[in-house]
Amino acid sequence: MSIKEQTLMTPYLQFDRNQWAALRDSVPMTLSEDEIARLKGINEDLSLEEVAEIYLPLSRLLNFYISSNLRRQAVLEQFLGTNGQRIPYIISIAGSVAVGKSTTARVLQALLSRWPEHRRVELITTDGFLHPNQVLKERGLMKKKGFPESYDMHRLVKFVSDLKSGVPNVTAPVYSHLIYDVIPDGDKTVVQPDILILEGLNVLQSGMDYPHDPHHVFVSDFVDFSIYVDAPEDLLQTWYINRFLKFREGAFTDPDSYFHNYAKLTKEEAIKTAMTLWKEINWLNLKQNILPTRGRASLILTKSANHAVEEVRLRK
């Protein structure tokens, strides 16, 4: 089926890997193999080929969108006769736990910051906006960590709203996966970035998810371009379990780790524990809150085995 025929049936243009890779045009590879190795996640295969065929075309597309947005801002300033404040272009990245959102975010940050314009690209994860464990315990939400109700949504929305309003210095809390909690007094200051990449589970949620409470303002209201990283559920489960097993041999062995006790599990016990955590928390959050937002994304990256993107869908 041609792209033209698809356009009549869906709000997305659909590309297989080869079609998408052809859209790279002449964008140069600006990352070395060593840099790519540092960018990838704990359980992901990220190659020069993946960056060249998937992420370079995506960075080219985003550069077009961002340049268009800058021209629009310039037109508005000319009309108003003002010198406007620098307003960041916000890119959100959503998707399930273990799908590779963080790797996608880091690769895009590296590529976009290397465009000739030398843009300042900041990366913020919404993990920092989780309520502290003390609050979650008081509210009985420790087993709902990552669900929408576990976040300080007021602070998260204010953060992106302030950035879009031109506030020069905005602070974001920082999360530690070692202590499984927000770092007290560990805020990061974000100073007028050209581009902000916001990575998190629920960044595509909108008022449609709360039909009985329509007065909410959401992060998605401030996002210029949204990406959903997708994969079949069986792969997500496998990746989650494999990641858990690697943490068991790595991060969990640190005595300061919140999950230090998991390091003592046998492999069979660890697999069983990971399966339970997946089914009772992460799969539930995926089905109830994350997956229903996929159709709102500007672009959907669908992965197959080894975290390789096999299909790209771009909203018209």
Swiss-Prot record:
Signal peptide: none annotated. The keyword Cell cycle does not apply. InterPro entries: P-loop_NTPase, PanK, PRK/URK. It is found in: Cytoplasm. Its EC number is 2.7.1.33. Pathway: Cofactor biosynthesis; coenzyme A biosynthesis; CoA from (R)-pantothenate: step 1/5. It catalyses: (R)-pantothenate + ATP = (R)-4'-phosphopantothenate + ADP + H(+). GO terms for biological process: coenzyme A biosynthetic process. One of its GO terms (cellular component) is cytoplasm. It holds the Pfam family PRK. It is an enzyme of class 2 (transferase). One of its GO terms (molecular function) is ATP binding. Disulfide bonds: none annotated. Belongs to the prokaryotic pantothenate kinase family. This is Pantothenate kinase. It comes from Shigella dysenteriae serotype 1 (strain Sd197). The gene is coaA.
